């Protein structure tokens, strides 16, 4: 049978045994990829600096997902939080990877078995002896089982009743760790940044799934509904399954890109909106102001800013800065962060404090402009010297560092001042090692960006797939030219047109 590539799946259309087989094989491929990818990432991952070289800077994709579910230790003796451990146990990164690979192998064997032994009694209708699936009943079984899994995850794993809990952090991604989470049953449970909502929603959705599954197992659909929604057609199952998948893909693309309790910034990196809104910058200034109010010096106040918080306030960690086709991790772009140089404060010769305007997300280049506390432009790096009025040289700008490696160091020569003014456009200033990975200096996106792009793209593709297969199953008779209520046996193929009234008939 010479089928075109886009019609090859018709071979399992009326073959339940082999339909099951190819789905088991697909599960084997997915689990095998996950386990293999985890082992690859563990082979290249450097856990030595969780502050300046976290997993998301290194381009890790599956390690963050394991970590948010409670895996923090490695058989290599390290912990994701930076410490060392002696007994990681079976549920370590390598243990989870190995479990996926073993599961993949078992699924592979099961797929082969079901391909060979495809003609099982369970797939046959007792009355006709032909292959037949009770799709509403199967739907009820699957709904019930997924409800049990959903409820179990929320009630046991997330809450720590039987499991580790999940990754929970503060709003600024500084104190994250795996811990049990109590369900949030109030209105706060609907806040996407409240971890308790994860527990309560899984418990509620799981309960609903269990009840709905039992309903569909005990109540048969009305005949009119059964026929209207083509519940006896396997392509209906395909269409509705695709709908569930694309809807989920759109949802997770949103929670990843805009941020939520399910996508902590310590594991996936900050969101672009945290740069756009000056989220970390405001918190840093708040802490410095609080320090000054306690009679600390400017140097002392800035020295107490956590390096981790300062690093978030750097445009190179913005996932929207990476180009669409720039492959590689963030470390391959601007380099591996080595240390915070400190916060530069610029002043003109009259002693006014000046602030460098920060580069917006979607700019590759941006003019260097320094404004005072009232937003009035006081200095810049001009494009044409002949026209300049506010150049660093003319205004006499100096820079002094507070906190970090250059704490207390000041510069007055214009070349150095301009260098740090350009770097201040990009947020807090860090020393970056470009030599180790031969980094090219061009920003890359984080796994947050990759995940969002991939899931949004496939969601759109699957949306069209849902429309396509839904239309095919609902209007099958129209497309085939066959009346669904046809009670005469028709010899199709005897004439060029299906449904030709001159076609030979034989009354049943």
Curated annotation (Swiss-Prot):
UniProt xrefs under SUPFAM superfamilies: Photosystem II antenna protein-like (SSF161077)
GO MF annotation: an example: electron transporter, transferring electrons within the cyclic electron transport pathway of photosynthesis activity
Membrane topology: Multi-pass membrane protein
GO biological process, one term: photosynthetic electron transport in photosystem II
Keywords: Chlorophyll, Chloroplast, Chromophore, Membrane, Photosynthesis, Photosystem II, Plastid, Thylakoid, Transmembrane, Transmembrane helix
Transmembrane stretches, start-end: 21-36, 101-115, 140-156, 203-218, 237-252, 457-472
UniProt cofactor note: Binds multiple chlorophylls. PSII binds additional chlorophylls, carotenoids and specific lipids.
GO cellular component, one term: photosystem II
Location relative to the cell: Plastid, Chloroplast thylakoid membrane
Recorded family membership: Belongs to the PsbB/PsbC family. PsbB subfamily.
Subunit structure: PSII is composed of 1 copy each of membrane proteins PsbA, PsbB, PsbC, PsbD, PsbE, PsbF, PsbH, PsbI, PsbJ, PsbK, PsbL, PsbM, PsbT, PsbX, PsbY, PsbZ, Psb30/Ycf12, at least 3 peripheral proteins of the oxygen-evolving complex and a large number of cofactors. It forms dimeric complexes.
Role of this protein: One of the components of the core complex of photosystem II (PSII). It binds chlorophyll and helps catalyze the primary light-induced photochemical processes of PSII. PSII is a light-driven water:plastoquinone oxidoreductase, using light energy to abstract electrons from H(2)O, generating O(2) and a proton gradient subsequently used for ATP formation.
Name listed for the protein in its UniProt record: Photosystem II CP47 reaction center protein
Source organism per UniProt: Manihot esculenta
